[in-house]
């Protein structure tokens, strides 16, 4: 099972955010675009991550019930959902700073650009968790297709 959110998540950091940084000359507009991007993303991406984690868990449960190795689907599930605690631990302070500036705190463009660039690379790092989960799941599937479920 590949995680459909991975491409979307990477696209945000590798395409959308650079466009925002390259085309905005006012911090207010840049903050508004970030807030909108975040709003759309936080409504969709966690649901996809949880659904993908649940699918990996379902595969693990089916394999366990069939007395087959089930550790790799669990690894895929845990790896995928690790993006959530990563967000809480590593990204919340950056998110909060950006939202505080968006609410009207005095924001100079350099500070806003630096915070959004920091968010961009933290988001790339966060995107690697579901990517790693998808890689584990694909490797497991390929191993089963080629050599059976040993």
Curated annotation (Swiss-Prot):
What are the subcellular locations of this protein? Membrane
Which Pfam families does the record match to this protein? Anthrone_oxy (PF08592)
The annotated pathway is: Secondary metabolite biosynthesis
The reaction(s) catalysed by this protein are: emodin anthrone + O2 = emodin + H2O + H(+)
A molecular function (GO) term? monooxygenase activity
Q: Name one GO cellular component term.
A: membrane
**Alphabetized UniProt keyword annotations:** Membrane, Monooxygenase, Oxidoreductase, Transmembrane, Transmembrane helix
Membrane topology according to the record: Multi-pass membrane protein
The enzyme's E.C. designation:
1.10.3.-
| Intrachain S-S bonds | none
> Mainly resides where?
membrane
| Transmembrane stretches, start-end | 1-21, 41-61, 73-93, 128-148
- Which family does this protein fall into? Belongs to the anthrone oxygenase family.
Q: What is this protein called?
A: Anthrone oxygenase gedH
Source organism (scientific name): Aspergillus terreus (strain NIH 2624 / FGSC A1156)
Gene symbol of the encoding locus: gedH
